[in-house]
Amino acid sequence: TYTEKDEEAQTLCVKLKDEVTGMVLELLYTIFAQGGIITRSARFTNEGTSLVHLLNAMSLSLDLPDKDYVWMQFSGAWSRERHVKERRLEQGIQSVGSIRGNSSHEHNPFIVLRRPSATENAGEVMGFSLIYSGNHRMQAEVDTHDTTRITVGINPQNFDWKLDCGESFQTPEAVVVFSDKGLNGMSQTFHKLYQKRLARGYWRDRPRPILNNNWEATYFDFTEDRLVEIAAKAKECGVELFVLDDGWFGARSNDHAASCTEPSVIQYK
C-alpha cells in the first residue's frame, strides 16, 4: 500500500537488534486515517560479520485474548476459486497456504475471523490479507489458555533466504481490517483501500487492457486460419492482445505429451 498525502497514514518503526548475531529487525506498523486499517511488515538487516540464513520471516503476528471466533477461508480449485469454508477456532493449529510458487486458486492469501454472532451487516469482524502472489501461509494457533495467535506471511516451507553482511530482506505487507459493522463493513474497507492505494500509476483509475486466450476455444485442435479468425473477432470486440496457449510447440497434442521449444509446423498448416 502507499499514500499520496502525509496525513493519510502514520507509520511506527520498532527496531530490535540481536547483539550476538548483529541481526536487526524492524517492525513496521502503519495506521491509516481512513479507520479500521493497520498494516504490518518486517525488515531484516544483517549488521553482523557472517552470512545468515532466514528460514522464517512472517509479515504479521497478532495475539488475541480469546478464541471465540469463526475462522473463514477462501479455498477452491481451477475454475471454482474462493469458496467460503468456516469452522470455530479450537485449541491447536489451523492454517491454509500455498507452496506452488504462487498464491494459487486453492487457498487465497486472505482469511477472516468473525465473532459467532456477526452477520453481513453487524458484529465484529477482522480480515487479514497478504499482499503477495507467492508461497504464503495464514495460521491461527490457540494455546492451552484459549488465547489466539495469528501469523501471516511467506510460507516457511522451503524458504531459505541467504542474507550477506550489509544486506536487507523486506517481507511483503500484511493488511488487517477491523469492522464492527459485519462482513460487509470489512469488505467495503478493503475495497476502498485497494482501489485507491494498492496499484498506482496510469491504470489505477482506468479500465485495464483486454487480452484474448485461445485455449477454451480450441484446446489443442487449431490451425493458423482458425487462430486468425478468432483474433479478428476479438479485435472487433475491443481486445488488444491475443495469447496463443498450449499446443503450439513440438508434438504436444494432449496432456500426456511432452513439449519442446520448437514450434509445431504441423499445427500451422
Give the ranges of each region predicted by the language model:
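Polysaccharide-binding surfaces and accessory modules of carbohydrate-active proteins
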Residues: 1-143, 157-159
